[in-house]
Regions:
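Conserved N-terminal beta1-alpha1 strand-loop-helix module at the mouth
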Residues: 1-87, 93-95, 102, 110, ...
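Active-site/ligand-binding-proximal alpha/beta "capping" segment
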Residues: 139, 146-192
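Helix C-cap/helix->beta junction micro-motif
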Residues: 58, 106, 165-167
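Short beta->alpha connector loops at strand-helix junctions that form conserved
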Residues: 89-91, 115, 136-139, 196-197
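Conserved dinucleotide-binding and phosphotransfer motif residues
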Residues: 81, 106, 188
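Conserved beta-strand segments that form the floor/walls of ligand-binding pockets within enzyme
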Residues: 3, 113, 134-137, 172, ...
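Internal catalytic-core helix/loop-beta-alpha segment
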Residues: 109-113, 117
């Protein structure tokens, strides 16, 4: 499985409808929506009001990544706003299971995320409880960072744990993804790659997406 999810955080918001139409015409599979609160990460992005134009102008499923504290207060509203999947950070909560159940009851796919400094083994107890795990390959909060190479070994580890249990849990990678490393990430066992500046900053974004899926 080779899923590409362009991150709308890197889009040109002065021409948002045009950028979303480009995504519609491309081979992209999902639209990745990064939600930041300025507390869990030192940056602020967007919230519920922008979910409406994302849903209105983009035909791709909305893959929502909550980089926020207290995700339990907001997951249901993002589900109601049109999210196809909702993920939140394991390190942001004491117990993820009740929050995952809130998402699941809305009929939305569940995802648990960790930053690069969180032990990947902490995801293992939840592999049977989620549809997807997201490994940050940069520190959450800003686009355009360089990929952290140690992510490759984490992908392999989680892939082995998923396969050993016979699960269908997907592995998504977010941060520093580009046409130069996408193939290696898929080869290591990733199913989905989030790409921001590598898509929206490319001379030919549609071609960049196609190349990453090769």
């Amino acid at each position: 499985m080779r899923i590409i999810a362009p991150s709308v955080l890197s889009a040109d918001f002065g021409h948002l409808a045009d950028d979303l139409e480009m995504i519609n015409r491309s081979e992209a599979d999902w639209l990745h929506v990064d939600v930041m609160d300025g507390t869990f990460v030192p940056n602020i992005s967007f919230g519920f009001p922008l979910m409406k134009p994302f849903k209105q102008y983009c035909t791709k499923p909305l893959d929502v990544h909550l980089m926020i504290v207290h995700p339990e207060k907001y997951v249901e509203r993002f589900c109601d706003a049109g999210a196809w999947s909702v993920g939140f950070h394991l390190e942001a909560v004491e117990d993820p299971l009740p929050i995952l159940e809130m998402i699941r009851k809305k009929g939305v796919r569940t995802c648990l995320t960790i930053n690069p400094d969180i032990d990947v083994k902490r995801l293992v107890p939840y592999l049977e409880e989620v549809d997807m795990v997201l490994l940050m390959s940069v520190f959450a909060g800003f686009g355009g960072q360089k990929f952290i190479p140690e992510t490759i070994s984490k992908i392999r580890y989680i892939r082995e744990e998923i396969d050993r249990r016979g699960l269908k849990t997907l592995i998504e990678i977010d941060g520093g993804v580009n046409t130069g490393n996408a193939a290696a990430l898929f080869a290591a066992g990733a199913d989905a790659l989030v790409a921001g500046s590598a898509v929206f900053g490319a001379e030919d974004p549609i071609e960049a997406i196609r190349r990453m899926k090769e």
